[in-house]
Amino acid sequence: MQRKGILIILDGLGDRPIKELGGLTPLEYANTPNMDKLAKIGILGQQDPIKPGQPAGSDTAHLSIFGYDPYKTYRGRGFFEALGVGLDLDEDDLAFRVNFATLKDGIVVDRRAGRISTEEAHELAKAIQEEVDVGVDFIFKGATGHRAVLVLKGMADGYRVGDNDPHVEGKPPHKFSWEDEESKKVAEILEEFVKKAHEVLERHPINEKRRREGKPVANYLLIRGAGTYPNIPMKFTEQWKVKAAAVIAVALVKGVARAIGFDVYTPEGATGEYNTNEMAKAKKVVELLKDYDFVFLHFKPTDAAGHDNKPKLKAELIERADKMIGYIIDNIDLESTVIAITGDHSTPCEVKNHSGDPVPLLIAGGGVRTDHTERFGEREAMKGGLGRIRGHDIVPIMMDLMNRSEKFGA
């Protein structure tokens, strides 16, 4: 019997012991009866998205977890961001990830502009698209929250351009670096683009309103992750001969899923932010599993809480995710399904960024050899029967349990 599969990524799930939580991690601190139930009837382990000690970006981590070698396939974040906001790009386009940020006296004081809403970001992006002219064709489009996408048409040869993002607050933006004449041209265009966009943003009514309300203004653009068309050798759906769907709100992860052949769905209320409607996602997964062989579910807010150094909020979000998972397992046949739960990487609250810590992994459902673990958490995962594996081992293990793998050899 061929089983169906559900892969759930709780973004930035892994963490470190936190004094505020009594020496527990947010996952260990959280009340997670549904994931604990799966742990008791499943098998735990740890996974390194790239390799031990290597912090992973969300893009490279997801590529790896879906079974691709990011060192061979990855050509920058920007292209995935662009695919994720629904742009169909040409192979000679150059795409970038952009943050709306707050600049004061030449210093970046907030890299996410107070986590402005998606609606605000889209209005600001529209104004930039309409009012900025840098002498080349470009597309500037809001994504999720403080995120946006910039595409320079026909300029892929300039991909060796650097970022202006200092990646920490309290420092001035970087100048765009370059390595050759093509990337020098792109760097000059980006400098002009950022300057003109800054002028548009400073006077925009949304920022005037935010000033009056005492909120951080979104008056600057931090641009990074120059990306060209990814080198995907074979679609996920072709490699595993499955019909695959994804339930995602965040543009970057949507882009990765689109690039490898998933049909992508975003139910109403799914925002990728703290206010996301996780139950709408759960219901969509159950609905899609009737027509698809493999369903991927992405939950973003846990990562944001790690970046914001909010341990108790991260634990609360994990509890919300657990209820989402509870709805799913209550409405599917676990014997005919394989379910895997992990994070794309660790985002420890103390680091406020991605780290190279391994990520706890849980697999349960039909055909799974159980171990003696009792609940889902970092330390319990260290005892699990899966041991410590690589991120790109997860899908092959799932497909084998789903009875969809082909034998190697005679």
From Swiss-Prot:
Write down the CDD domains for this protein, in alphabetical order. Answer: iPGM_like
Task: Identify the InterPro entries for this entry.
Answer: Alkaline_phosphatase_core_sf (IPR017850), ApgAM_prokaryotes (IPR023665), Metalloenzyme (IPR006124), Pglycerate_mutase_ApgM (IPR004456), Pglycerate_mutase_ApgM_sf (IPR042253)
Q: What pathway is this protein said to act in by its record?
A: Carbohydrate degradation; glycolysis; pyruvate from D-glyceraldehyde 3-phosphate: step 3/5
Q: List, in alphabetical order, the Gene Ontology terms for molecular function in this entry.
A: metal ion binding; phosphoglycerate mutase activity
Respond yes or no to whether keyword Isomerase is given for this record. Answer: yes
Q: Name one GO biological process term.
A: glycolytic process
Q: Which UniProt keywords are listed?
A: Glycolysis, Isomerase
Q: What is its EC number?
A: 5.4.2.12
Record's Pfam families? Metalloenzyme, PhosphMutase
* The keyword Isomerase belongs to this UniProt entry's keyword annotation: yes
For the protein in the UniProt heading, the enzyme class is isomerase
Q: Per the record, what are the reactions this protein catalyses?
A: (2R)-2-phosphoglycerate = (2R)-3-phosphoglycerate
Going by the entry's taxonomy, the superkingdom of the source organism is recorded as Archaea
What does the sequence similarity comment in the record state about its family?
Answer: Belongs to the BPG-independent phosphoglycerate mutase family. A-PGAM subfamily.
PANTHER family found in the cross-reference section: COFACTOR-INDEPENDENT PHOSPHOGLYCERATE MUTASE, METALLOENZYME DOMAIN-CONTAINING PROTEIN
What exactly does this protein do?
Answer: Catalyzes the interconversion of 2-phosphoglycerate and 3-phosphoglycerate.
Q: Which protein, by its recorded name, is this?
A: 2,3-bisphosphoglycerate-independent phosphoglycerate mutase
Q: According to the entry, what is the taxonomic lineage of the organism?
A: Archaea, Methanobacteriati, Methanobacteriota, Thermococci, Thermococcales
